[in-house]
Amino acid sequence: MRIGITCYPTYGGSGAVATELGLELARRGHDVHFISYASPFRLRGFAERVTFHEVTQLEYPLFEQSSPYALALAVKQHEVAKREQLDLMHAHYAIPHAATAWLAKQMLEHEGLGLKIVTTLHGTDITLVGQDPSYYTLTKFSIEQSDAVTAVSAYLRDETYRAFGCGDCEVRVIPNFVSAADYYPPSDDFWRERLAPKGRRVLVHVSNFRPVKRVSDVVKIFASVRKQLPATLVLEGDGTDRDLAEHEVDHLRLRNDVGFLGKVVNV
């Protein structure tokens, strides 16, 4: 098959899963085309049957405060789908990717061409962003207009039905995954001993450090754990709340017990 995949390229679960899925599809003989404003962070180097298409935007004074990225994305999705004869477009994260895929599909149908849309719901696109009044109607419409919809958990599926209704569409649960060939417990304690002294418990938090991830609360909870037993907190990732977490660590006098590793490609 010829498959288009649109995802956010930045550090985060939706982009990571989308990229790993695309790479595995390519290894199985499918042609995969990633479409986004930057190359996904998990897409490193050359991969056979994988092509990246960058979405470029017009720099114009009128758009200084509100660059219409979604429109540029829809145009690029239409362009790639038409030129590469895509069979389907897989939109990861409903806003705006499912909506722009639908717009691209309408342009293709106007030209006598078809395109199937698969939308995967990842979390905050439904529980936070999608339920905001500014996006609610469009999110509901995009889900209902998709040819297939998946969610990464049963909770997210149920929340989609509760918040949006979507009675006419089936949301299938396909949990996130990791490759057991690439991610497996080490055979020794080499890395563990470098993260924490022997005998200490190791707690790990991995995220993009956005407010919804509540990293400062993680630090506060760890402070309670630390009062009960020897432990080390390892924070992997970076984002807007990194400084807030650093401040909380210093405020609770946990600097010797908390490590910030920053962005780590292979966790």
Residue ranges: model-predicted function:
Residues 62-88, 98-99, 103, 133-137, ...:
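An amphipathic, basic-hydrophobic alpha-helix
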Residues 108-118, 124-142, 158, 186-187:
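Nucleotide-sugar donor phosphate/pyrophosphate-binding loop at the beta->alpha transition
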Residues 5-19, 213:
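A short, glycine/small-residue-rich beta-strand->loop->alpha-helix junction that serves as a flexible
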Residues 246-264:
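Nucleotide-activated donor-binding/catalytic signature segment of Leloir-type glycosyltransferases, i.e.
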Residues 150, 192-213, 219-226, 234:
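Conserved donor-binding/catalytic core segment of Leloir-type glycosyltransferases
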Residues 129-130, 161-162, 177-194:
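Acidic anion/phosphate-binding donor-loop and adjacent secondary structure
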Residues 7-11, 23-69, 239:
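N-terminal strand-loop element at the rim of the active site
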Residues 38, 155, 177:
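Carbohydrate-associated surface elements
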